[in-house]
Amino acid sequence: MMRDAEERITRLEETVAHQLKTIEELSDQLAEQWKVVEQTRAKLDRLTERFLSLEEQAQDATPVTRPPHY
């Protein structure tokens, strides 16, 4: 009976060690993904600013009218 308890404790310790390793790996991956999200967000912000600037410039441009042959 004591041997069964020791084996059970050993299996539980192995399981906990495996879970700790998995949690650490997932945490590292999450941190890397967060960096990618932040970089993507920064790019989107820059593109949005550029788009709005170009849109504003286009509104200031001469309006397109029908050519005289229409």
From Swiss-Prot:
Q: Which InterPro entries match?
A: SlyX
Domain of life here? Bacteria
**Pfam family name, one:** SlyX
Against NCBIfam families, the record matches this protein to: PRK00736.1
Q: Which family does it belong to?
A: Belongs to the SlyX family.
Q: Which HAMAP family does the UniProt record give? A: SlyX
Name of the protein = Protein SlyX homolog
Q: Which organism was this protein described from?
A: Rhizobium meliloti (strain 1021) (Ensifer meliloti)
Query: Gene encoding this polypeptide?
Result: slyX
